[in-house]
Each structure stands twice: as structure tokens, then as C-alpha cells.
Amino acid sequence: MSELIDDFATIYPFPPKPAALTEGEKAGLRDNIARLLKACNAVIVAHYYTDPEIQALAEATGGCVADSLEMARFGSSHPATTLLVAGVRFMGETAKILSPEKTVLMPTLHAECSLDLGCPEAEFSAFCDAHPDRTVVVYANTSAAVKARADWVVTSSIAVELIDHLDSLGEKIIWAPDRHLGRYVQKQTGADMLCWQSACIVHDEFKTQALRRMKRLYPDAAVLVHPESPQAVVDLADVVGSTSQLIQAAKTLKQQQMIVATDRGIFYKMQQACPEKNLLEAPTAGEGATCRSCAHCPWMAMNGLKAIAAGLERGGVEHDIRVDEAVRQRALVPLDRMLSFAADLKRC
């Protein structure tokens, strides 16, 4: 498999950690948010990697906690006229692409994703132009502009199936932006894939030496790994899968202990799925490495109660997701293909 860049060495300016709130302040904000959601005919669409209190709030107010594929489905089908997307910016853009008639708000427009940042539209478009014989498949963790350049958009939950399908048609692939997920998919399918070389700052921090030590401490534990992790970490896994697939695995596996190599935000829904099991965070390189926050995305952490309340109260340029209409229409094509393909998989 060819590679575009040899090393992933970008250091991103991470946001400051949100200020701590008292329990009284949190209760007041939750009440205010519930009132604002009703007043705005809004619903919260939250990702598994947001903080547990945000996921609980989404559930309590009739919203959704899900992976990026289910977030897209939920937002486009829900009758609310306003979507409050608790996640990172590409998730808000995806919601707007699929639901242009709705107001899409985010707690902050500064919640980034290293995969998105690591795949600028101009450079990626030039790369695609240099390989016109290849089908362009981009991960959901990309900007609207990059999606608009793609033939397909895909999430980790259906990546192997989609690439296997395209490979069966004899198509050669450009894959972007996650290098680890790309390598995993290529290994599973044998497809001819030319991969962009970005990575998730959280999953890139999981290390084999530390994971082996933890496996020795918990020899009966199952190891669950997200495929955005380095290949050597994936090789130590009992189960490799997307967020929703890892939650399902934790529920169905016979082991009572799970070592989980993904963002620790997933533990909220995973523990709901298997309350009797012991969930353990897989070790990372730790604070001081490229991931400041030890298996928790610092941009996901920006989706706090104060920021959600501010988004609903103010809206406007600080919170309102806007996508150029020409870009939106082009990006809608590969997104619709993804949703149709995923629906076909469900029917099989």
C-alpha cells in the first residue's frame, strides 16, 4: 500500500480545559438547557466521546447519543427544526449537509478534529487530481469541502464492507485521512489503497508495550480496540471495531473485564450496555505527549453545559453551522451513497 507522507508529527494547539462547575451550577444549567430546547424546538445529537454528563443530558431530553453514522441518521429524520450537535465541527457540518432546512448549532465552532485538520481541502484535491484513475473514499472525520471532493464517505462501522465492495468491482482507492484505519481496512480486504497520512491524536497514543503490561495484570480481560489505533495495538486486540461495535462486543463477550482502547467517553454507554462488567482504560503515552488528555479528545471536552446553553441562547456566527450551498450539494452525493450502502447492509 502506497503512502503519501512518512511521519505524523503535527502538534495542534489544544483548547484549554473547561472550568469546573459546582453541582448547583450544573443543575441550573441543565434546567436552563431543557427549557431552551423546548423553546427552540431543538434536540441534542451527541457523540459517544463527549463527557458523560452531556450524554446523560442528551438522553434525558429526548436526544441521541451515537456514533457518527447514527448521529447523521438521527438528525436527518428527527422532527426538530434545530439540531444541537455535541461533538466536533465535521459532525455539525454533516448534519447541515443532510438537513439544510434545519438550524444546526454547536456549543463551539472551535471543536476541531486532528483528522479533519490533517487533511486540508486544497492539498487533498491536488492529490486526488494526481491520481484520476482512483475512487476517492473519505472517512466521515473530514470537512464538508473534502467530502465534496469524494466519491464515497464512510464511517468506521462500515469501512471494511464498503472497501471490500469497491475492491470486488476492481476499483483502486484513494483513502483519507486516517492512516491507521486505512491500513487496517487494506489488511482486511487486500484492496489497492493509496492512503493519506493523518491520525487521531487520541488513538495514536495507545502503545503496545504498556498494553502488554496491562494484559499481564488482567490476563482474563478481553481487549477491545478502535481501528484508528496503530496497527501494532490492533494486533493485540480480541475485538476491533467502531464505537458502536465495541459497545456491542462488551455486551456479548463472556469475559467480565474489558480493556478498552478508544476515547474514554465511550464508557458511559458501554457501562449501560453491560453494567455488571469491569471496564478498564487502555494505557496511552499520557499527558505531555501529543494527546494532552490521556484517551479523551480535548476538543470533545469543549462540549460542556455552559457552552451548550450559550449555543441555544445566542446562536449566530459563534454557534451556527453554515455550509456553502454548492459545497453542500456536492458533499451530499457521497454521504447519500454511504447511507444507502449502510441501509443495504442492515437489510442483508
From Swiss-Prot:
CC cofactor note: Binds 1 [4Fe-4S] cluster per subunit.
Required co-factors: [4Fe-4S] cluster
Localization of this protein: Cytoplasm
Main location: cytoplasm
A cellular-component GO term for this protein: cytosol
Enzyme's top EC category: transferase
Pathway: Cofactor biosynthesis; NAD(+) biosynthesis; quinolinate from iminoaspartate: step 1/1
Keyword check for Transcription regulation: no
GO BP: any one term: 'de novo' NAD biosynthetic process from L-aspartate
Reaction it catalyzes: iminosuccinate + dihydroxyacetone phosphate = quinolinate + phosphate + 2 H2O + H(+)
Record-listed iminosuccinate binding positions: 47, 68, 139-141, 156, 226-228, 243
Residue numbers binding [4Fe-4S] cluster: 113, 200, 297
UniProt xrefs under InterPro entries: NadA, NadA_sf, Quinolinate_synth_A_type1
An annotated Gene Ontology molecular function: metal ion binding
Keywords: 4Fe-4S, Cytoplasm, Iron, Iron-sulfur, Metal-binding, Pyridine nucleotide biosynthesis, Transferase
EC number, UniProt record: 2.5.1.72
PANTHER family named in the record: QUINOLINATE SYNTHASE, CHLOROPLASTIC, QUINOLINATE SYNTHETASE A
Job description of the protein: Catalyzes the condensation of iminoaspartate with dihydroxyacetone phosphate to form quinolinate.
Family, per entry: Belongs to the quinolinate synthase family. Type 1 subfamily.
Identification of the protein by name: Quinolinate synthase
